[in-house]
Amino acid sequence: MICRSYRPIAWLGLCLVLCGLGARGAEAARAAPEPDCNRRCLLQILQIYTEGLLDNNTSRIKAAATLRVTSNGSDVPLGKGEVWGSAKRMPYRQAFVDPVTGAVMFMGTVTNAPTNQGERWWFYMVRLKVVAKQVTEVEEISYDGMLRGNSPSKLTQADRIYDAVLPVSEQVSRAELIATANKYFDVVSGTLDYHEAPWHPECSRLEDAVLTVNQPESAGSCAGEFENPRLKWIVKNRRIYIADVERGVVMAVSNFTSPPEYPNNNASVAFEVFKIQDGLIRHIEAMFRGDSSMKVSTWPDLPPETPPKGD
């Protein structure tokens, strides 16, 4: 009689436990959906793309029917960008991916000859958007000029600091990574005092193969150089595609436009990557066309990211 009287209660308890586990499992599945193309998948798509560039062959690139391609700001067919057909070697390579957004970004150098005496060298940047393992967007920028007399051939080995995974204690959220990049752009735009940006004491910045801070030609630090009021561009169309929490990497493409008071400041569209460690800007690397020939980007602004619950 005692066992018989407790049996319904036991079954009820078991049902409640199982229902609770199922609810938590369903909630976890909703909170962290698996991306349809993870880091490995995105990197493989980029590898196919860069090999296609060097082979001048687009046949293995899985392009969506809605694919849009731009080269230096102009719409072009796939495989018809400035360096396609000329690029034979890609000595400098730096890849970045974000499975959350399906973004792939790359900064490198290409040359048209298999030796160091190539007739032409380019700084080369590309952004891909991947949806359902197909490429839906390609944004290429290439530049065969020099900044302060430094050729793209000067770049040989990418800085692996961007690949280093940070200890959890030194990581910040996606939202903070994005906010930190925007603070930097606000400083450049002159809307935020540079003292208010989170600088790391080791901060350095590389632009088109040139260290532009802490050097004889540009003695200012990442922060202190903004004491010079001429260092100003209005940064528009800030498209932050990558926010890698584990590595502390955030990357964007933006329009740097000349301010009215300094109309001779070179306007361009820049690929720019930041290493954020302990919430501080430790390293910055940018590539862009260093002359006035770059067209203003016609890629649309990105909507703000909606942070996941608990972020």
Across the structure, where does each feature detected by a protein language model lie?
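C-terminal and inter-domain tail/linker signature
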Residues: E27-D311
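Bacterial N-terminal signal peptides
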Residues: W11-G20
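Bacterial N-terminal signal peptides that target proteins for export
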Residues: M1-L12
